[in-house]
Amino acid sequence: MASSFSAESAERIIVALDGMAPDQALAFSAQVQGLRWVKVGLELFVQAGPEVVIQLRNQGLRVFLDLKFHDIPTTMAGACLRAAALGAELITVHACAGSEALQAAQAAVVEGAQSTGQPVPTLLAVTVLTSWEEHRLQRELAVEQGIAERVSQLALLAAKAGVGGCVCSPLEVASLRAQHREPFALVTPGIRPQGTSVGDQVRVMTPPAAIEAGASQLVIGRPITQSENPSGAFAQCCTALST
């Protein structure tokens, strides 16, 4: 049956394979009609290892490897080089690792991809996790800035380091897009279709609103993966972006 949504809409949605065993993740990704992108996070990667990235790519999928590297520059660069060599097309690092580490990571993803004939991935700098609330950020980490100001500072740091984009909550997308035009990518989790539970995310938005605000791609997990009809839930999200 022909899809009711455009390929462009499908490219904008990354389905997070969180909470799945390796076999479940592979079976799930194979069954969702029209799926283009999947996210492999820490839990799945630790269970399955690098092979899961290769297996998902063999299904014709594009992989967002969301391991959020945060270490000294040499270590971050080595990890990013190997992630790029696997064929992951989006890779995350923490912006607060600093400019030297970000520059080293960016150079490494280019080297890793080119040395193995893979597409050069987009390196994404994580700003402030969507589970953080402003009062906790100030109390627990002694960050005096508000979340919006902190996100803006970290995104600027990433852009100056030559990183290809950042990860932020949908609530910061509009202000960041005003500061950083395309092709600087803004990838946002914290996406919840109308009428679904927000779960452990506290800074959330619907898919159409996030795209309208300037997001490049959206990360959606449980509203699709825990649906009784994952293909239908994915199609509904895509259709919402097509209208």
UniProtKB/Swiss-Prot annotation:
Its EC number is 4.1.1.23. The active site is at K68. Pathway: Pyrimidine metabolism; UMP biosynthesis via de novo pathway; UMP from orotate: step 2/2. The keyword Ribonucleoprotein does not apply. GO terms for biological process: 'de novo' pyrimidine nucleobase biosynthetic process; 'de novo' UMP biosynthetic process. SMART domains: OMPdecase. Pfam families: OMPdecase. GO terms for molecular function: orotidine-5'-phosphate decarboxylase activity. The keyword rRNA processing does not apply. GO terms for cellular component: cytosol. CDD domains: OMP_decarboxylase_like. Substrate binds at residues 18, 39, 66-75, 130, 192, 201, 221-222. InterPro entries: Aldolase_TIM, OMPdecase, OMPdecase_AS, OMPdecase_bac, OMPdeCOase_dom, RibuloseP-bd_barrel. It is an enzyme of class 4 (lyase). Catalyzes the decarboxylation of orotidine 5'-monophosphate (OMP) to uridine 5'-monophosphate (UMP). Belongs to the OMP decarboxylase family. Type 1 subfamily. Homodimer. This is Orotidine 5'-phosphate decarboxylase. The lineage of its organism: Bacteria, Bacillati, Cyanobacteriota, Cyanophyceae, Synechococcales. The gene is pyrF.
